[in-house]
């Protein structure tokens, strides 16, 4: 049997944890403008599976691509890189 394909891994910030076992992660990347060459900030939200509800709003997390878990969930939480600072 062959190994699994390389899966996408993103690092982003949790913007919502209101759903049970699901977090919304905002991933920011930069793309180069095709004509002018300037780097433009680009962001996208992904829903990720958080089995134990450990991630909270503001945490920096790492998510990995997985099989479809629902109509919109295609990622799962790998680790919490940095906990949010509560002021």
Curated annotation (Swiss-Prot):
Pfam families cross-referenced by the UniProt entry: Ribosomal_S17
GO cellular component: cytosolic small ribosomal subunit
Transmembrane intervals: none
Domain of life: Bacteria
Single biological process term from Gene Ontology: translation
Keywords: Ribonucleoprotein, Ribosomal protein, RNA-binding, rRNA-binding
Keyword rRNA-binding: yes
InterPro entries found in the cross-reference section: NA-bd_OB-fold, Ribosomal_uS17, Ribosomal_uS17_bact/chlr, Ribosomal_uS17_CS
GO molecular function: rRNA binding; structural constituent of ribosome
Alphabetized SUPFAM superfamilies for the sequence: Nucleic acid-binding proteins (SSF50249)
Role, per record: One of the primary rRNA binding proteins, it binds specifically to the 5'-end of 16S ribosomal RNA.
Protein family per UniProt: Belongs to the universal ribosomal protein uS17 family.
NCBIfam families (alphabetical): PRK05610.1 (NF004123), uS17_bact (TIGR03635)
Quaternary structure (record): Part of the 30S ribosomal subunit.
Protein name: Small ribosomal subunit protein uS17
